[in-house]
Amino acid sequence: MSNQNERVAAAPFQEAVESPAQRILWERLRTYDHSFPLSDYSPETLFSSDLQTLEHEFRRFGVSELDRGDQDNYVNGYDALRSFHERSRSASVMGSPYGNLEDVPYLPSNPFFDQTPWSDDAYGYMYGIRNTLLSRAKDGIESHMLQYVIAKGLKETIDKIFDNLISHVCELMLDYYGHKVFRKLMEKCTDEQITRVLDIVLEEPFEFVRLCVHTHGTHAIQGLMRSLCSEEQISRFMETLCYVSLLLTKDVIAHRVILFCFNQFSPSHTRYLLEVIVQNCYQVAIDQNGCCMLKKLIRQSSRELRDPLIKEIISIAVRLCGNCYGNYVVQYLLRLKDYEVTSALSKHLDGNYVQLSYDKYGSHVVQKCLESREFSSRRIIAELLSDIDSLLVDPYGDYVIQTAWIVSEDHVRHVLLFYINRNVPFMRCNVYGRKLLQKLNIWT
């Protein structure tokens, strides 16, 4: 008997079902009835006002007026994720915003966002619960919705979003999703708002460094740099950056801020930053990340910027050659194949080739100099002959002699062969000497 009454009560609604979207609404109402049993769904029911509100919420999201493509999407996965604000309001009526799922976890078929969640009021979507705007910006799905609102919203909407996030700007810049919202917001901010962000970011140098060395923070800082437009803003930023630049150049992540700065701003703005790097060139070059930054800076910068840096590197080239990281900076200058650079470098290295050949890292530089067409290999070999007896049995010098043998012409090779033959008995008693004889195929 109860089943018959249930069919009678449901009949008016079943007759009204004309589209997949309305079937969805019908299924949701049946779920609501399962959670809160009612005698019927007539307007006189105690909960009729709640049901009307519920139906209005469905229509607000376009359920009752979908086109054919949207209907197909909702048929295949009608449980598209709604905003947190809408879910919280639905939960007060239905218990669970997606029906009585018992212990089954909810996995939305549409992992992105509603098609038109801000159809009524763009800012009303997020402003309903004021304190959750930061959590929305840090949410994987709702951050996309917030970025859309920022991109399409009016100035009043952006101002309200900015006022709610400005006090949490540093936390936002360090978050995986939040820093994307921050960068989008910077594109829409006024000069006054950007200045307010600068006041917070640059207030404490330690906090600024913490942002720059963070994976997401460094991208957020670069987004802020793109938004700087006035001379005052750029000058304030560069002043703080110069103060901590030595720390940033030695960090694997933060050195990108230094490189981006030279690409983003004019030489007049980066002049003092370049001076700091040049004055501390040796400290930067002997650091693992610093040497990489110097090579990128030389490769990417204009001649106006890189010439002072190259000049300083050449002046300390002998010291750099003996360092495990600094020698790569000197080798990079050889790869430029610039006659003026190699000529100046050759003048500073002359007289030091023997000393460098005994060094683990310096020997690599000597080998590169021998292979470089811009260097005179004959002059280098002539210097090596002054102490060739020791180089032939040295663990690093023997590699230099091998390279000299390969790059030398016949008449120079005959000179090398004379000295090698003279030291064969001594070389046979030494592990490195024997290896050299085998490499040169002159084992006798």
Swiss-Prot record:
Q: Which UniProt keywords apply?
A: Cytoplasm, Repeat, RNA-binding, Translation regulation
Please indicate if the UniProt record lists RNA-binding as a keyword: yes
Pumilio repeat spans: 128-163, 164-199, 201-239, 240-275, 276-311, 312-347, 348-383, 384-418
| Gene Ontology biological process terms, A to Z | post-transcriptional regulation of gene expression; regulation of translation
Q: Name any GO cellular component annotation.
A: cytoplasm
Notes on the domains: The pumilio repeats mediate the association with RNA by packing together to form a right-handed superhelix that approximates a half donut. The number as well as the specific sequence of the repeats determine the specificity for target mRNAs.
Function, in words: Sequence-specific RNA-binding protein that regulates translation and mRNA stability by binding the 3'-UTR of target mRNAs.
Under what name is this protein listed? Answer: Pumilio homolog 15
- Source species, please? Arabidopsis thaliana (Mouse-ear cress)
Q: What is the lineage of its organism?
A: Eukaryota, Viridiplantae, Streptophyta, Embryophyta, Tracheophyta
